[in-house]
Amino acid sequence: MNKEEKKFEKLRKKILKRALIDINTYGLNKNMLIQSAINCNLSEGVLGRLFPDGIYELKQYFFNDIDKQMLKNINKTKSNNIRIRDKIYNGVIIRLELFTKDKNAIKHIFVSEASTPIKSFKNLWNTSDLIWKSAGDISTDYNHYTKRLLLSWVYLSTLLCWFNDKTKNANETKLFLNRRIDEVLEFGKKSSIIKSKISNFSIFNKLIKILKELKSIKV
């Protein structure tokens, strides 16, 4: 990155950091983004250059930033002695821990995402893909898609649980995630005949149902 690119990136991070605070006061909208720029002593013109697509681009920048932090933290705890099941669990927990300090703002972001299912699925798929790859998955066949769809369901349903979790250290969420992963492992043990009846389409429908629940959350 050259000097100008570093400056550009620094300003984008500054806006994002401020926006995660301002979302709690103004909601997730254009006015909030403008207010965040003002709070960072930046003009609306500069804001337009930093995030030309407004809120949508801010959200994408947020998800990309979280992805980088998640992979960095996963790599810190990587061990060949950990089961794949536990690597998946750790990946989801690490991501939720990154969300913790901005929990209410994160809720706003995901409720907003639920209104645009296609974009939401794209982000869910990317998260699941990164977690699977970090766990050592190199599958390229039909299982490649099923694994990512199932993890998207596990992650999104766990996120919904986490939003309502008031227990210390999110213990309720951790128990919920363990149960969800166990359900997926049970699915993996079923015969190919049974699996064929539980298609990727049915998993996709489960995701749609959770997105509808997210959309109805009051923020």
Regions found by a protein language model. Give the residues of each.
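Short, amphipathic alpha-helix enriched in basic
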Residues: 2, 7-35, 39-42, 53-60, ...
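Hydrophobic/aromatic-rich alpha-helical bundle segments in the mid-to-C-terminal region
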Residues: 137-153, 157-199
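Key DNA-contact positions within bacterial/archaeal DNA-binding proteins
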Residues: 45
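Amphipathic alpha-helical packing segments from all-alpha helical-bundle domains
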Residues: 115-137, 146-152, 156
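Amphipathic alpha-helical segments used for helix-helix packing
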Residues: 96-118, 125
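Long, charge-rich low-complexity segments
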Residues: 190-219
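Hydrophobic alpha-helical connector segments
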Residues: 9, 73-105
